[in-house]
Amino acid sequence: PGIVFVAGREESALRILREARRQGVQAIFLGGDGWQGIVSDTAAANGAYVGTSFNAAGRKPAVQRFTKAFQDKYQTKPDAFAALAYDATRLVAEAIAQKGRSRSGVREHLASLTPAEPFQGVTGPIHFNASGDPIGMGFHVAQVVDGSLVSGGGNSRSRPTVIAAASEHR
């Protein structure tokens, strides 16, 4: 196969990648945000592509401030899960500040967000559709290159940027 997409989390993805490598499968492997920690096994994961909703190497000032504060406190770069938790916490805090502590007030604030006036999170601008699903957050595809998640992939003509390194996921 040319491309193999594996839906799943880190543990199952690594089992599949290891077995595929053992059997000599020559394919591009692609996974979602549950794959972020696969960089810890550089032999199995090298060359795989990982979808993520956050790029710690992003250029926006809010992303840089969040990444620096996170690194200063935890001595590692934040991953998408940390960024999503940060955005969710800030979003609820903003809703409470605007509409009070009631569930209906928080819901009202979240429903008031629009594409023209979204919540500006570190994962991107966020608003919600009529069903309450988040819309507008960013999505990045990174490639595992020598134990790091690299934005743009290792074969990009632009200079690749390290998003997270293997040592940060152990």
Annotate each PLM feature.
Residues 1-170:
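Extracytosolic ligand-binding ectodomains
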